[in-house]
Amino acid sequence: MQTIAAPSPNFNARTAPPDMIVLHYTGMPTGEAALARLCDPEAKVSAHYLVEEDGRIFALAPEERRAWHAGVSFWRGETDINGASIGIEIVNPGHEFGYRPFPAVQVAAVTELLGDIRARWTIPDARILGHSDVAPDRKEDPGELFPWKALAEAGHGLWAEPPPAPGAALVEGDEGAGVFTLQAGLTRLGYDSAPSGAFDAATATIVRAFQRHWRPARVDGVADGETRARLIALLRLAA
């Protein structure tokens, strides 16, 4: 696999080997602008790699170092996601500048890059995540158009499409055992969703993040039967 060197000064030392990969979209008008920002010492942001829409892969920071891509984030009790992960920025204008599908050549490059990274580090499928998974209250990337299913079919990440679970949908304002079970499942998967039994705004935000990754056809924050069934199936796969 060929990469283009584009060294960023924005990294520091790790305290442990990475065991997670976090995928982002750049969310800027052009890839050139994103690359410039990721290499700007005043910006204090970076990633390990940037993948352009034409499939070119830029190497920004050594994998052995802690790049600054995740910000305030959480997954399975870990709050230093930068320290635990390798960050990949995927060029796409994002929701603010004209979100669009990811070209096949770009997805192929991301897939190849994931295989290359995972040949060097022990990174389980359950720990290949989106920025919106680890920071659902702040981020939406790489978003509902990112082909997570195709990535999983290529051997990277989790995916499940079981039949919908029975029962009424759970929505913001609901309370009870069903909501508690939903929150407990989201927490087991990795989200910061302490079970309370009350479906509040924070729970709806996390459900939307889950849907962006694992039920992208409809991202509405409603825990319907399809959403709940996929959560249950993913918990089995991640166990």
Language-model features and meaning:
Residues 1-126:
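Active-site-adjacent loop/helix surface patches within enzyme catalytic domains
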Residues 50, 144-166:
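Acidic, His- and aromatic-enriched active-site or binding-groove loops in soluble protein domains
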Residues 74, 94-105, 137-138, 168-175, ...:
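Second-shell loop/turn segments in exported
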Residues 75-78, 138-144, 156:
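A charge-rich, low-complexity, intrinsically flexible signal that marks solvent-exposed coils, linkers
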Residues 123-138:
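Acidic/histidine-rich, metal-coordinating catalytic segments
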Residues 170-238:
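Short acidic, glycine/serine/threonine-rich helix-capping segments at coil-helix boundaries
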